Amino acid sequence: MIALMAAFLLSTNATPRELVESCRSMVPKTVEIDGRIILRNRRGIPQAEYAYVLKRLDGKTDLILKDADGKPVDFERQGRILKTDVTWSDLTLDYLWWDDFSFDAEREAESVHGQVCAVVVMRKGDRTVRVWIDRKTGAMMQAEEFSGDRPIRRLWGTRIRKFGERWMANVLEVETVGSGHRTKITVEELK
C-alpha cells in the first residue's frame, strides 16, 4: 500500500521532501541484515572479505564485522571501513535523514538502469551527497559523496531481491574514485 501510494505521489511533480520521505519509508526501523563486504581489485579479484551483521532497532544502529575465521574485527565508524571503499554511511544510509536537501537542477530526469530519476543533493555540515531517486517507486538508485565539487565515492545497486514482503538491493557496489578497486556489499539475509 505504501509503495502504491509512493508511486502515485512520485508520478507527479514530487518535491525533494516527498522523494526523500519515500526513500526513508523503505528503510526498516527495526531490521537485522547479514551479508558480506568484499574488496576487489580492478580485475574483480577479491583482496579482502568480511562478514557483517547490521542491526537496527528503533533508529539505533550497530554493526558487527567478522574476518574469514569468524572472529570479530574492530573498526572505526569514521572514514572507510578496514581499507575497503565502504563507510558507515553506505551501510546505514544515514544521509537520507539529513535535513538540508534540494533538487540538482543540472541533472533533471537522469536515468539509472533505465529508470528516470530525480537527483537530490543532500548536505550536512561540510558533507555533500548526491542521490538518484526513481521517480516511479521512490527507491534510491545510486549515490555519490563529494569533496568540494568533485565526487570521491559512488554507491549503486546491481541486483534486487525480495525478502519476505520487502524488495531491496541485495548487491551493491561502492567505489572510491581513482582508487583502482571496488567493494561489493551483499545482503544474504534480512530479518
Give short role names for the model-derived ranges.
Residues 45-51, 151-154:
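Amphipathic hydrophobic-ligand
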Residues 2-45, 57:
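N-terminal leader/targeting segments and the immediate start of mature chains
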Residues 113-191:
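Gly/Pro-enriched, hydrophobic low-complexity segments
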Residues 48-95:
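An acidic-aromatic
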Residues 51-56, 103-111, 131, 158-160:
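Short, exposed beta-strand/loop patches in secreted or surface proteins that constitute
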Residues 33-37, 52, 61-63, 172:
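One face of beta-strands
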Residues 17, 95-107, 151-154:
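A short, amphipathic edge element
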Residues 15-16, 22, 26, 56-57, ...:
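Intrinsically disordered terminal and processing segments
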